[in-house]
Amino acid sequence: MAPKDFFPPAPLDLDWDNIGIKVREVNGHVECAYNVATESWSEPQVVKGIDLTISGLSPALNYGQQAYEGMKAFRDPQGQIHIFRPEVHAARMAHSCEVVSIPPIPQVQFIRSVALAVSVNAEFVPPFDSSAALYIRPLAFGSGPQINLAQPEEYTFCVFVLPVTSLLGTKPVDALIMEEFDRTAPMGSGNAKVGGNYAPVLRWAAKARARGYGIPLHLDSKTRTEIDEFSAAGFIGVRDDDGKTTIVVPDSSCIIQSVTSDSCVQLARSYGWSVEVRPIKYTELPEFSEVLAVGTAAVIVPIGSITRDSLRDLIVYKPSEDGGYPCADKLFKSIKDIQRGLGKDVFNWCVPVHEPGAYFQPVSA
């Protein structure tokens, strides 16, 4: 049976372009457990609902021993469902797990579990012509109950899914540089996707929003002279060198290795643009013709301005005469066309999803 014959059409009773990021019930999620004795993860199981049973004494809740990912699945015009760049997300998840002492999930198991979660929730994958996608949230954590600060006897790996639209939308947003808070320490865990890097940002992001800024921007915490990343997205600067386009990406050991940023780099090179991956000085910001916030949730969002209070700096990035940002628009269209099957996947980024039986076993209650 061909995948497009198995998967049901997306529900017609949802306003796909306006569903936002509200959590809603889906068919279920996937769980795996780690066996310390065999040093292996169990086969993925489908569990109904979106709730977990977890000990109040788990190191995940008490000491923050958890790591997660963010990725998406899409439907193409033929009805085929596929996941965008799961191998890269698997590698990043493995790195994050190692940082917080969780046994890494093997790539094959990670992709099987993710694909199974998408497959059993196939009707929640939006139509190809909507602005929505199926967001995928893999999560690993120490789950065995204990009070001492040591490796637990139990670990859990889960995959949740949720239909969403873009987190930041597609219009330009204004950024505020964080000067009273450092996102990460120079030799810390900033390059891992773990909750401890995000929860402390919440109150600062709320303060920025209250002042009308859509996203915080972080400088390096050691010297505060270089660009690291936005609080929920990677940073890309665009420079116009006498008609030749160059994109500049931060090279820092304290930032997440953005899958979307890497996709932009590969696309830029295919366009014939120059690419520089290096430390970016704060003083370079006025030299850019565009600045982009890039990430799985945000996709590609142009930055309208960057404010730094202590220096009373306001750096504005003006749109073109037609109101757009040419490089952001070009990259956005290329990525979205590949994701939705409207453009040729020359990089082999999209992995098709098949019926649940291809990934394995019965549903548990």
Curated annotation (Swiss-Prot):
The modification N6-(pyridoxal phosphate)lysine is found at K193. GO terms for molecular function: branched-chain-amino-acid transaminase activity. Its cofactor is pyridoxal 5'-phosphate. It comes from Penicillium oxalicum (strain 114-2 / CGMCC 5302) (Penicillium decumbens). It comes from the Eukaryota. InterPro entries: Aminotrans_IV, Aminotransferase-like, B_amino_transII, BCAT-like_C, BCAT-like_N, BCAT_family. SUPFAM superfamilies: D-aminoacid aminotransferase-like PLP-dependent enzymes. Aminotransferase; part of the gene cluster that mediates the biosynthesis of oxaleimides, cytotoxic compounds containing an unusual disubstituted succinimide moiety. The first step of the pathway is provided by the HR-PKS poxF that serves in a new mode of collaborative biosynthesis with the PKS-NRPS poxE, by providing the olefin containing amino acid substrate via the synthesis of an ACP-bound dec-4-enoate. Keywords: Aminotransferase, Pyridoxal phosphate, Transferase. Pyridoxal 5'-phosphate binds at R92, E229. Belongs to the class-IV pyridoxal-phosphate-dependent aminotransferase family. One of its GO terms (biological process) is branched-chain amino acid metabolic process. Pathway: Secondary metabolite biosynthesis. The keyword Transferase applies. The lineage of its organism: Eukaryota, Fungi, Dikarya, Ascomycota, Pezizomycotina. Transmembrane segments: none annotated. It holds the Pfam family Aminotran_4. Its EC number is 2.6.1.-. This is Aminotransferase poxL. The keyword Transferase applies. Induction: Expression is positively regulated by the oxaleimides biosynthesis cluster-specific transcription factor poxB. Gene3D superfamilies: 3.30.470.10, D-amino Acid Aminotransferase, subunit A, domain 2.
